[in-house]
């Protein structure tokens, strides 16, 4: 019995959000003694105030996140979470034309796949409930990480009693508890204390950026009959060149909405109630007063905080065999691809695949051998995830431009139509939209970028070839027989010629 206990590793997880909680489940399933330390109170308690003083932007759970949860081997957990989600099969673009409101659906996927709208607290509560039932897991809320020695494998936490200021001791220091560990997983968000202390030991390249966009949360209430006011199976977007309003469905039949706009625009909106209402009428037709009353709009804008958006990259994601950082602590991304949660959960799957592959859980190995194996696993994890998380960081920035305006442009619609047609009718090509690769597969993010660029080059080549050949044929026909063909017949001929060239080109690609 003593030998079994000796071989168990002790893991300290900093942060009890979805990513940290999933990491604890993975480790507990492998026999580790797990302790989770969370700065806030019990996140299942409605009175616990989020760190940003508001509900977060509604979460989108897609294939990567679902796959990561399934690999925890907690089938009931996955089923319970998915039961409380709402599938969104595409975007619903809203606008006004000549005084009339219109909406246009854009499916995410030609095969009918959907992403899932999920409330953060629903997901987090399910994970914490699962952890509380796991005997080799201990939860410590209201504990702040104040220091760490990653060579000695020790950490110090300050215990905070809610509503009370910590009292210093005789040495004028707030009392701390000392915790020993074999390794630590830092999952404590973009302003990570674990990352901060790791950077005292590791030479970390770090890049942080605040974009000139603030966000504020709004709510579209249910109808008087308790139903959704607009389609619940879409992500609703009111696009603008410099700003955007989106709405995601919630389980209580309301919609959680977010206004993204530059700081200067927020200042203009806050200068008078009239500016706010008029701006919504001009730029987000059909929202006010149809979905949100002017009074509620003003109250929510005034009451809810106007928060910044941060993105960050860093490398490496670990130090020796002592600590590894995951989720927003390693790679906070902008929310415009709905991949922040999914990338974080995928971190855990990849991390433990690396640990398993390198023998970190080989119980027959000595403690030194396991530490060496863990160091190699952490290095492999850093090598893989840095490339991929930097990629999704860049993709998320690009998708903001697409959502604000690109969804309305003819070029975006043309490329989407061509790529979806190829995916549907010539599946042997392996052709997919970039969005499908990101949201409905587990393909590495860095590979997604390479695939999308290759497809873009092929499409550009096809378009150029088609235009050049068509113009050449028309010029030849005019030169040879200027009176024989009417402009209409030439247009019809050009269309047939264009279609024939495209079909031939893609058949060639398919069988190359």
Swiss-Prot record:
Pfam families: FAD_binding_3 (PF01494). Its EC number is 1.14.13.9. The keyword Mitochondrion applies. Pathway: Cofactor biosynthesis; NAD(+) biosynthesis; quinolinate from L-kynurenine: step 1/3. One of its GO terms (cellular component) is mitochondrial outer membrane. Catalyzes the hydroxylation of L-kynurenine (L-Kyn) to form 3-hydroxy-L-kynurenine (L-3OHKyn). Required for synthesis of quinolinic acid. Belongs to the aromatic-ring hydroxylase family. KMO subfamily. This is Kynurenine 3-monooxygenase. It comes from Aspergillus fumigatus (strain ATCC MYA-4609 / CBS 101355 / FGSC A1100 / Af293) (Neosartorya fumigata). The gene is bna4.
């Amino acid at each position: 019995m003593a030998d079994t206990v000796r071989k168990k590793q002790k893991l300290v997880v900093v942060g009890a959000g979805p990513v940290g909680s999933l990491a604890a489940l993975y480790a507990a399933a492998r026999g580790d003694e797990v302790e989770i330390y969370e700065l806030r109170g019990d996140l299942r308690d409605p009175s616990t105030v989020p760190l940003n003083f508001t509900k977060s932007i509604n979460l989108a759970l897609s294939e990567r996140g679902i796959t990561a949860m399934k690999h925890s081997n907690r089938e009931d957990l996955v089923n319970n979470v998915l039961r409380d989600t709402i599938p969104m099969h595409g975007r619903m673009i809203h606008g006004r034309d000549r005084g009339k409101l219109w909406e246009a659906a854009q499916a995410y996927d030609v095969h009918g796949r959907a992403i899932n709208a999920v409330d953060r607290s629903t997901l987090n509560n399910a994970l914490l409930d699962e952890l509380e039932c796991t005997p080799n897991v201990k939860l410590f809320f209201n504990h702040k990480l104040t220091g760490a020695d990653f060579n000695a494998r020790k950490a110090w936490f300050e215990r905070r009693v809610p509503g009370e200021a910590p009292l210093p001791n005789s040495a004028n220091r707030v009392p701390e508890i000392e915790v020993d560990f074999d390794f630590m997983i830092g999952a404590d968000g973009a302003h990570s204390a674990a990352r901060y202390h790791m950077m005292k030991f590791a030479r970390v390249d770090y890049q942080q950026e605040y974009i000139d966009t603030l966000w504020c949360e709004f709510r579209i209430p249910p109808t008087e009959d308790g139903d959704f006011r607009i389609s619940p199976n879409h992500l609703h977007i009111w696009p603008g060149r410099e700003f955007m309003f989106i709405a995601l469905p919630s389980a209580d039949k309301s919609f959680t909405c977010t206004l993204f706009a530059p700081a200067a625009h927020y200042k203009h909106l806050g200068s008078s109630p009239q500016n706010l209402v008029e701006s919504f009428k001009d730029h987000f037709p059909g929202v006010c007063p149809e979905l949100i009353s002017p009074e509620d709009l003003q109250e929510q804008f005034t009451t809810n905080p106007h928060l910044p958006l941060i993105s960050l990259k860093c490398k490496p994601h670990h130090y020796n065999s002592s600590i590894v950082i995951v989720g927003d602590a390693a790679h906070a991304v902008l929310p415009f691809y709905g991949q922040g949660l999914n990338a974080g959960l995928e971190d855990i799957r990849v991390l433990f695949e690396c640990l398993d592959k390198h023998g970190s859980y080989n119980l027959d190995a000595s403690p030194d051998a396991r530490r060496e194996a863990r160091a190699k696993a952490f290095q492999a994890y850093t090598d893989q995830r840095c490339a991929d998380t930097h990629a999704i960081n860049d993709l998320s920035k690009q998708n903001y431009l697409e959502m604000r305006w690109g969804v309305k442009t003819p070029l975006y619609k043309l490329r989407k139509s061509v790529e979806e047609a190829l995916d549907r009718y010539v599946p042997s090509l392996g052709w997919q939209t970039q969005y499908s690769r990101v949201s409905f597969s587990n393909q590495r993010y860095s590979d997604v970028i390479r695939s999308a660029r290759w497809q873009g080059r092929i499409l550009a080549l096809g378009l150029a070839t088609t235009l050049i050949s068509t113009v050449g044929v028309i010029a030849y026909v005019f030169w040879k027989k200027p009176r024989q063909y009417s402009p209409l017949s030439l247009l019809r001929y050009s269309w047939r010629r264009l279609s024939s060239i495209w079909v031939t080109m893609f058949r060639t690609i398919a069988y190359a």
